[in-house]
């Protein structure tokens, strides 16, 4: 597993008995297939300062903590996945608290969780999510690693990051299997950026250029083929039936990544 602190797991364990990447694990059925919806915002990140490959936290929060973007997150939940077990990754602790409040104002059982919370409060929030009394968890960095819930079926990537490691850690919070869970839906919030401060998205992190709303991004070959056959006929796969999306929509994504050109000059901790 990739770690944000840059620690090399081989230093601890020396020998690797078995190694499997995300793509292989999904294709072999170890992890659930992954679908994606990209939601474009009108937020401009081009003048957000960066340090290595980290956004300046104050710049980022000032860009993202605005009513219009927050409402877009809430509206997206209500429109596409209302009632589904969802984790929303937010830009800051205050941002997470605001999104949770807006969701509650719209009748959604949502809570924010952060490292600022007392241990007993944090444990109760996580337990309520596990037992079903809470449908949505809004978090900043607390849930990036060391926690997951197999019941999570939707991830909102509402916190831009230029770190592939952080994005993959967040993605891992929803990929585990459990009874009744057919796949994971990732909703990427796509803000405007230039080629040198562009955040990761599911397609960019997996180096997949073609995007079609709700289509499989990763899946076993037989499931992917079944979906594509239905799309070719102009029909919606069963998983799409309740989602108001036009099956003809598609997009080619710019996969340029300047980090690949300078990776030898940037520490693994930053990547």
Where are these regions (language model features)?
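Post-DEXD/H (motif II) to motif III coupling segment of the RecA-like Helicase ATP-binding lobe
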Residues: 1-37
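A conserved SF2-helicase RecA2
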Residues: 19-32, 50, 176-233
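SF2 helicase motor core recognition
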Residues: 29, 137-155, 171-176
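Short, basic/glycine-rich phosphate-binding loops at helix/coil junctions
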Residues: 41-58
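Conserved strand-helix element at the start of the C-terminal RecA-like helicase core
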Residues: 61-106
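Long, largely alpha-helical accessory region at the distal end of helicase-like NTP-driven motors
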Residues: 78-79, 85, 196-271
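Conserved helicase ATPase core of P-loop NTP-dependent helicases/translocases
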Residues: 87, 96-104, 108-144
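Conserved SF2 helicase motif VI
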Residues: 162-182
């Amino acid at each position: 597993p990739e770690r944000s602190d840059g620690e090399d797991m081989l230093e601890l364990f020396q020998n690797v008995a078995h190694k499997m990447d995300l793509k292989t694990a999904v294709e072999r059925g170890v992890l659930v297939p992954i679908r994606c919806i990209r939601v474009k915002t009108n937020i401009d990140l081009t003048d957000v300062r960066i340090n290595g490959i980290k956004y300046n936290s104050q710049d980022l929060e000032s860009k993202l903590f605005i009513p219009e973007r927050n409402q877009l997150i809430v509206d997206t939940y209500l429109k596409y996945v209302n009632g589904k077990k969802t984790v929303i990754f937010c830009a800051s602790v205050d941002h997470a608290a605001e999104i949770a409040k807006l969701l509650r104002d719209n009748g959604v059982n949502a809570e924010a969780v952060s490292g600022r919370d007392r241990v007993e409060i944090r444990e109760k929030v996580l337990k309520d999510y596990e037992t079903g009394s809470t449908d949505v968890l809004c978090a900043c960095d607390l849930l990036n690693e060391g926690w997951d819930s197999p019941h999570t079926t939707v991830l909102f990537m509402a916190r831009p990051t230029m770190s592939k490691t952080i994005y993959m850690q967040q993605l891992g919070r929803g990929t585990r299997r459990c009874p009744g869970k057919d796949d994971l839906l990732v909703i990427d919030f796509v803000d405007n950026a230039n080629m040198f401060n562009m955040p990761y998205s599911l397609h960019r992190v997996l180096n997949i250029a073609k995007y079609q709303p709700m289509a499989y991004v990763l899946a076993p070959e037989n499931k992917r083929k079944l979906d594509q056959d239905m799309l070719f006929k102009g029909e919606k796969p069963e998983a799409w039936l309740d989602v108001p999306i036009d099956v003809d929509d598609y997009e080619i994504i710019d996969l340029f990544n300047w980090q690949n050109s300078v990776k030898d000059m940037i520490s693994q901790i930053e990547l």
